[in-house]
Amino acid sequence: MATTRKLVVEVVDAKDLTPKDGHGTSSPYVVLDYYGQRRRTRTIVRDLNPVWNETLEFSLAKRPSHQLFTDVLELDMYHDKNFGQTRRNNFLGRIRLGSDQFVGQGEEALIYYPLEKKSLFNLVQGEIGLRVYYADEKPPPLKPTVAPLETVVEEKTEETKAEGPDESKPPPETNDIPAEVKETVKPPQPPPEESSPAEGPKPDEEASPPLQENATVGGEEPPASESDKNEAEAKPVEEPPQNQPDGEDIVLESEDTMSWASAPRSPLPEVIISRSVSGSIPETKNGPQPLRRSVSETASYTSEISDVSTIERSTFDLVEKMHYVFIRVVKARSLPTSGSPVTKISLSGTMIQSKPARKTSCFEWDQTFAFLRDSPDLSSSPILEISVWDSSTGIETSQFLGGICFDVSEIPLRDPPDSPLAPQWYRLEGGGAHNSDLMLATWTGTQADESFPDAWKTDTAGNVTARAKVYMSSKLWYLRATVIEAQDLLPPQLTAFKEASFQLKAQLGSQVQKTKSAVTRNGAPSWNEDLLFVAAEPFSDQLVFTLEYRTSKGPVTVGMARVPLSAIERRVDDRLVASRWLGLEDPNDEKRGNRSRVHIRLCFDGGYHVMDEAAHVCSDYRPTARQLWKPAVGIVELGIIGCKNLLPMKTVNGKGSTDAYTVAKYGSKWVRTRTVSDSLDPKWNEQYTWKVYDPCTVLTIGVFDSWGVYEVDGGKEATRQDLRIGKVRIRISTLETGKAYRNTYPLLMLVNGGVKKLGEIELAVRFVRTAPPLDFLHVYTQPLLPLMHHIKPLSLFQEDMLRNTAVKILAAHLSRSEPPLRPEIVRYMLDADTHTFSMRKVRANWLRIVNVVAGMVDVVRWVDDTRFWKNPTSTLLVHALVVMLIWFPDLIVPTLAFYLFVIGAWNYRFRSRAALPHFDPRLSLADAADRDELDEEFDVVPSNRPPEMVRLRYDKLRNVGARVQTILGEVAAQGEKMQALVTWRDPRATGIFVGLCFFVALVLYLVPTKMVAMASGFYYFRHPIFRDRKPSPVLNFFRRLPSLSDRLM
């Protein structure tokens, strides 16, 4: 039975509302509007924290499915003036929710939305709690009292036919409807003819829409919307629904909906199809009728599921067009064989063979082949040969049944959005086929053709795993298990008042976590610990709790409890969910009388972003809960054109070969290009699109060599890992809006011998902003991670552990796809091995710090040169600047800001315009790295190197650690000397400092501050003839202060 989709909004409560009645309270009610339908809750009298707990429903039966993603749910909250008059505005706040934030039933969660202002001068505060989700319900059964209704409809129909329409006579009950409601009343509709079983529709009459549940009988007016003031005056036309909440529901239908519902349906015009066939095949008049359509909606492989027809399709303007000759072999008839024949297609010296035909009423293949062609207009005219062979007698002794030849220059050119070419019947010539026909279609198209993804391509060698594919990462959640306490856990072998140690172990799949050991004497230990896991949808696993009693001989299991993940509540904020008591069952005890129990609080934290990438190259920061997603601010388009000068990655049949493919990852969407077989200069020319929610994210592209199933030196190596060729990262924030970048990037790999260039990849990328300019700039002021990361932050240990778990889950999920995305590819794209130790990275990071501080060092050097009058003109100008800033201190901040503005404006000329930044071997110190350091970087844990080499590396690391230890000691000593100024560790030094502070306080109190500042400035920039070459007394005094270094052992 068909179901009806509806939008359900649960208005739960509100908090901290604005007082409106003049007595410190308000009487709020909520009005919701969705697609012309309006609902209203009841009024909560004099309460700033009202609780409604009402469920309001909106019908989506008349809403086209592709337009559901563009609707907005508007919620307005008002103060009811009937419960406390006020001269001020009774507006309490509003929110607007896009339909992309709505989830299906079962995924909903209570979310508190902050109330927003309607205008700048509104005083709004507080938040409202909602649950919004889609629900499907079965239509109600037909009522048994339909016969009288049909009689009335039939009689009214006869009267209508006899009298005809009378436009001068007003419809009944019009005078009883209020003025504001009359504007939205539908015109009278003719009663549906299909409601009468005795009288069928006539061919010369237009078909009326079916009778709705709320339709009136005998041409009466349909129900109109009613306001609160006119509810008692207006005459009701239909009964309210039975499931209407306590509050008053206002249902308003827009004029567009009414006209759409009342528009008559015109019959489809007869479609006449003419088709040319070859030979003496008779013309088929009873062919399949094509579907009518007004606008071509040909989908391409760049479109997503959520794309709607109103969105412009990708035009493939970032890549080059690659022309293919497509041959679609559908079926054959009247073949003189009883086996499973095959078709062979030959073009330009390339021959391919189809799969064996399926024997039904005809011989069916329904297979499409694509031959690469340089251009649609060739000077020569190659011949396309299609032949049918009977393979039942063996592959080598196949019998020729017939064939067809085509001139490629006469094959039509098709480019979407053109409609697909219909296959035709062709008479087979030659062989043993005399009256055999083959149905096929041939055309010349590009990679934008909808048949291209599933076609057998010549550049992929027909490998099933070589197709282009779009993957979606599984939806990951953080599962928080709060272990509170346990009861009745005293083992029988222990006596009272004897301490016992207990530990709770939680396991989810391969994830195992344990609490700390809790010691108790009464059998009621307490932990209050949070255990975090990563869970992937769909939730089919179970969370297993095992309570262990710690003994000297080892842990002893006291009991176990299982909780299915589907029964765990979801939350999107830090509110406390209801806890539960779980009964523990002893797996070795058959008696289940008295059982111990444990107190647990379980929830899925949807307010976190599950990290699966390194923080500095993350491609998505959205939380798990879809309700918290912000609207997209733009789209990024990536054109993967091809690679050049690739090195052979493997040996196939004694010959070097590379079967390259590209993987791109952004957010939860992965794309994989087709695998170009045995080519060192592969061309893909595939274009993909992603939605951008945060511009400060990174798009990652990796190139790999596929092993597949090949004869490698005489043996099949199907289980070998795909080899890495290189990787490119593109930060979205570095792209200008609307500008297309087409660049060639080197593919670099760091191996044990150093940096190795394995080729180049040519990419085209473009970022298009879809959000308003101010909204787009407002994103830069928002935190990167969701709010829960700041309210209840995770520790570094938890982040690393959960990230490694998330990578394993994603790798296992994507490896089960077809074609699979292998785990080594996923780990390389997610940078799962970036946490390994490397002396090269240590030195590179140190040089990065030096480069950052270099600007400050230059400033200090310039100030020192100014002090010593190396440039007298500059020193005199600095004196004048000091005098001006001291006497006019209001100019200090503007001068600094103007100086930074000048620097930024000056550097604008030197910005990168064409090339995008990519991996820098010099910055990474990869071009000058020591071989021993690289070998140490690629060493596994635990090390598999010889003991002597491990000892040498350990001694080197000890030397580096000693230098780091010295630097840390110096930093700690300087801080301790600062503390010694007032701690009286050195009584004389502290006395001098305290006395000087008292003297400075008196001077600054008696002497104007500007005079003191000017004197200090002139003293600091005094001429060298007034200086002494010894260190300053202040520095000497600070160096003599004591530290705690002499107390270290």
UniProtKB/Swiss-Prot annotation:
Q: Which UniProt keywords apply?
A: Calcium, Endoplasmic reticulum, Membrane, Metal-binding, Repeat, Transmembrane, Transmembrane helix
Q: Where is this region: Disordered?
A: 136-249
Q: Which residues bind Ca(2+) 1?
A: S338, D390, T393
- Which segments cross the bilayer? 883-903, 989-1009
Q: Where in the cell is it found?
A: Endoplasmic reticulum membrane
Domain C2 per the UniProt entry, residue ranges: 1-112, 302-426, 460-582, 617-745
Known cofactor(s): Ca(2+)
Function as written in the Swiss-Prot or TrEMBL entry: May function as a signaling molecule by regulating the trafficking of other regulators.
Tell me the protein's name: Multiple C2 domain and transmembrane region protein 16
